């Protein structure tokens, strides 16, 4: 069901990053507020940079949907080694790729989800969300590249000039 839904929605929005679990950050002074305060999308939503495709639940990244920065292994491992979805979100923002959230009102229990249920602490969410590592890694990327977000989700350099991608 998961892959079928992603492929179906991708056929309707072929250039969009499609996900089954997405959230929207609240912003303050150009930076994302704490990850656990972000709003989860509860309806199908098509939008731009302020949609964060969460790796939990599945994400389909079409070819060329991410900036070429995505392959810079050393920067990824330095800035956000525990949060590939944060890295992909940033690379999608640089490319200004639309995001499409397909809301799921039920869960598919994958082997991974069952494993994590019986092995508490094995999922990255325990570190990234509950120990605030997502917040630190998002801030590390934004500080390293000298960018902030405006209220529409556009990346701006710290001197308020829009970044041309």
Functional labels for PLM-detected ranges:
Residues 2-73:
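Conserved catalytic core of nucleotide-sugar-dependent glycosyltransferases
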Residues 68, 73-165:
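C-terminal catalytic/acceptor-binding lobe
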């Amino acid at each position: 069901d998961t892959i079928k839904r992603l492929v179906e929605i991708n056929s309707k929005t072929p250039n969009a990053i499609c996900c089954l679990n997405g959230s929207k950050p609240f912003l303050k002074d150009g930076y994302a507020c704490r990850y656990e305060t972000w709003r989860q999308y509860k309806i199908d939503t098509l939008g731009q940079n302020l949609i964060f495709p969460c790796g939990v639940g599945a994400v389909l990244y079409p070819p060329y949907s991410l900036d070429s920065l995505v392959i810079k292994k050393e920067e990824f491992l330095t800035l956000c080694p525990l949060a590939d979805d944060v890295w992909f979100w940033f690379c999608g923002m640089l490319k200004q790729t639309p995001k499409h959230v397909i809301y799921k009102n039920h869960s598919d229990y994958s082997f991974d989800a069952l494993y994590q249920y019986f092995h508490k602490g094995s999922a990255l969410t325990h570190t990234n969300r509950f120990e605030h590592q997502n917040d630190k890694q998002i801030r590390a990327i934004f500080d390293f590249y000298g960018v902030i977000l405006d209220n529409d989700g556009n990346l701006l350099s710290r001197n308020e000039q829009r970044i041309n991608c």
